[in-house]
Amino acid sequence: MAKKLEKIITRNENFADWYTSIVNNAKLIQYTDIKGMMVFQPNAWAIWEAIKNQIDLEFKKHGVRNLAMPTLIPLSEFQKEKDHIEGFAPELFMVNQIGDKKLDNPYAIRPTSEILFCNYFKNIVNSYNDLPIKNNQWCSVMRAEKTTRPFLRNAEFHWQELHAIFASEHEADEFAKTILDVYTDFVQNYLCIPVIKGLKTPWERFAGAQKTYTIEAMMQDGQALQSATSHYLGQFFAKAYDIKFQGQDNQMHYVHQMSAGLSTRIIGALIMVHADDQGLILPPDIAFNQIAILSIFANKNPQLLTISEQIRNELSDYRLFEDHSDKGVGYKLAQQEIEGTPICILVGVKELANQQVVLVRRDTHEKINVNLIDLKSTIKKLLLDIKTNIYQKAKKQLDESIVFVNSIEELKQVIAQNKMAKAFFDGSKEDDEQIKLLTNASTRCIFDETQSGQCFYTNKKTNKLTLFARAY
């Protein structure tokens, strides 16, 4: 077993402190003097770049083009859409002064960019021939969060926001669902995080949306994390910002809109779904180092460097890290465990005498002696095995933790066991708030299922099978 660094707190001791110690020890985040504003260190940014590259590739398959919007929005523009301004007003960072000049119309630092995209679309769309228009930007946004935690609630966070306009409601709504499917496929197949797809309740929708589609993931402590959302915005923004096109009937019509986003919050999900008490466990597809080549006292055995170079050349298709320092092998392994490297290759004199190296799997800690001639094929197979194993482990926990309930008492019991519940629910926002007071759980999403039953809270007949959980 590799050396365990003392600074990592175990999950059983305190899950929140464990999370923070993982973030710190894996060199993901550095705090600054401004609450909620954090440095994304190279390890974290490499994960985000891998996420960004794959999502961007998928978006392009659906005709989405990237652009960049300004950071500032005149406050007067926010006030054109009542629901939107009410939804974001408490979170706005404001620019009230430039130099020594006070502004009559202050600027808001974008918390999201619907308004910017609306003004852009208004200026470029004329007729139905211009539609659809699908754009995305990768940027940071700022929201004044009362309580901040790395990745989960940053005052400034990085994300992508996709905005698109269409001639019809059907097209816009279907594209919102398509993008949710893109997120679902990516999060499950690349990040190895099983998710639950569903529709947000009206009171949990994005401000100004008619529908909000979501994917919810379960963390190891039983809490849900909203991992990505896609919204059908209807014509609310189009009417507020006068986005019209000339239809085939030669009449002017308002466009139908959608938007969608996935943020660096997903890195928090990666940690809380996969990591253990030794550190990160990163899926091979997005690990910043997929393989670490660790020589054992190469300073005393120079031939190990020659073999390590041969291994590096043979595995050049992978993201590699090498450590040939005189640090002990236990320390080297512990550092790679913390940083979540899927496979470590130990290059030592004893093994090389038999033309072998030792592979150490991060997910199971298993050590495997491998002949050098079989190294490349074994690595390929192991990376696939690791990917499958960490997904199946998370999927098993999710499946075993969703319990159907018929009463508020059953819901209390399930939530107290750090599980999630599903129940037929046809209550109101006020009912949901009361349930949260009683159980600490709230509605996360409505399942996309056609069955019906009796609401566990109001006794009404309903087809809304709903997920309840504590949530981040």
From Swiss-Prot:
One of its GO terms (cellular component) is aminoacyl-tRNA synthetase multienzyme complex. InterPro entries: aa-tRNA-synt_IIb, aa-tRNA-synth_II, aa-tRNA-synth_II/BPL/LPL, Anticodon-bd, Anticodon-bd_dom_sf, Pro-tRNA-ligase_IIa, Pro-tRNA-ligase_IIa_arc-type, Pro-tRNA_ligase_II_C. The keyword Membrane does not apply. GO terms for biological process: prolyl-tRNA aminoacylation. It is an enzyme of class 6 (ligase). Pfam families: HGTP_anticodon, ProRS-C_1, tRNA-synt_2b. It catalyses: tRNA(Pro) + L-proline + ATP = L-prolyl-tRNA(Pro) + AMP + diphosphate. GO terms for molecular function: ATP binding; proline-tRNA ligase activity. Its main location: cytoplasm. Keywords: Aminoacyl-tRNA synthetase, ATP-binding, Cytoplasm, Ligase, Nucleotide-binding, Protein biosynthesis. Belongs to the class-II aminoacyl-tRNA synthetase family. ProS type 3 subfamily. Catalyzes the attachment of proline to tRNA(Pro) in a two-step reaction: proline is first activated by ATP to form Pro-AMP and then transferred to the acceptor end of tRNA(Pro). Consists of three domains: the N-terminal catalytic domain, the anticodon-binding domain and the C-terminal extension. Homodimer. This is Proline--tRNA ligase.
